[in-house]
Amino acid sequence: MATRVVIVGGGFAGTAVAGRLERLFRRDPSVEITLIDRENFSVFTPLLPEVPSGALEPTHIVSPLRARLRRTSVRQAEVHVIDTGRRQIVAGHCRMCAEFVVEYDYLVLALGSVTNFFGLPGVATHAMTMKSLADATTLHDHVIGKFEHADLDPDPAARRRLLTFVVAGGGFAGVETAAELNDFVRAAGRYYPNLRPGDVRVALVHPGDRILPEVSEALSAYALRKLRGRGVEVLLKTRIAACDGAQVALAGGEAIPCQTLIWTAGVVPNPLLEAIDVPRNATGRVEVDSTLAVPGRSGIFALGDCAAVTDTSTGKPCPPTAQYAIRMGRVVAENIAAAIRGGSPRPFGYRPAGMLASLGRRSAVAEIMGFRFSGFFAWWLWRSIYLMKLPGLERKVRVMLDWTLDLFFPRDIVYLRSMVRAEGMAPVDVAHEPRQR
């Protein structure tokens, strides 16, 4: 009888597990690998901020799961129930579609995370997010829609409100989103003769005393100077209190009139975990031991954003980054293989090679193996490293072509509202809840 390994989640962690298992059991048909995800593709999220800015085509940073994982049975479906007692998963292609049951011997929980709005009034309703391809394409269309609207509005105050874009969160996602968005909106303004440069405003709101707290203070200070020098208004030690769609209220009592709030200020584990019989810590993440196995649940592993994994080098929780997720995936796959073959599992341990953050317009910061870089060379490193990590030769070539064209031609300002509606996304002027993965 075949040994059934089922992976729930097709992000960095889930695909890393499946890919490693395929290599470990390449010539062993007795091991069946199944991956369930609500999408049939994975997104290379480090490049996601370049999609709303028009630097990259959306489909060029995704890779089809079926093409990447040829030995894995990929099921595009939403998981409805995970019954750890019966070792079964109930899922369906959609909420209204017929359900099917998948049984497992080994279960891998790679469910990822969703955006954390911290219960702030109006934020979940009005804020946009940057966690999925749909988020990125919707943001692109939303921004162009605001320019088109502002170009027709004779009221200067109304124009400024329409063309003020607030990004919440000064981590990697927030800084890169603000930098790319700033480059895009500054360049787009030249196509709208009724608008003035002073009408456009990009603000980055961060509760900490410095942006990019994951890198050194020197690189953080460089990033701050670069963003401010390019027109991004960086508000440090500032918290957002609420959003009503017409303004963003700050905790100090001030308000920023705007119709665009992009939220990158935190994540929480996938709420599907609440219905699964596994131990969870105070933050809602699945508790795991040093081998990434769930204590007291035979054959169940958890990793990535949904798992409470301790970084052995620092003693702190592992950050929700692709580097850690991929390395965890390899360890989980090897420990499943060890369990099947009667071997001993190995503990997870990883020291990240470095951190990189793009600041737009051919500048970045990088901290690699103790060395620190900033400016053009760091930007070149950022692009080179992520291009190498992008799955698939075809995608690499397409991204290289996009970047080459971006050197010589202006970015696209086509308004795709009709296409957004046709795909079933939220309307461009209405924010939507993030997808749960």
Please annotate each region the language model reported.
Residues V6-V8, V102-G112, S132, I240, ...:
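Short hydrophobic core segments
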Residues A13, G112-T115, A178, V267-P269:
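Short glycine-rich anion-binding loops that position phosphate/pyrophosphate groups of nucleotides
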Residues A18, D183-R186, Q323-Y350:
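Internal hydrophobic alpha-helix adjacent to the cofactor/substrate pocket in enzyme cavities
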Residues T125-D155, A246-A249, A255-R327:
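FAD-site-proximal beta/loop scaffold in flavoenzymes
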Residues E32, T72-I89, N182-S290, V294-G296, ...:
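A Rossmann-like FAD-binding core segment of flavoenzymes
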Residues M1-V81, F165, V175-V215, I262, ...:
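Beta1-alpha1 glycine-rich phosphate/pyrophosphate-binding loop at the start
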Residues M1-A2, S73-A168, F184, I262:
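FAD-binding core/adjacent interface of flavoenzyme oxidoreductases
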Residues E334-R437:
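C-terminal, flexible cofactor-proximal segment of oxidoreductases
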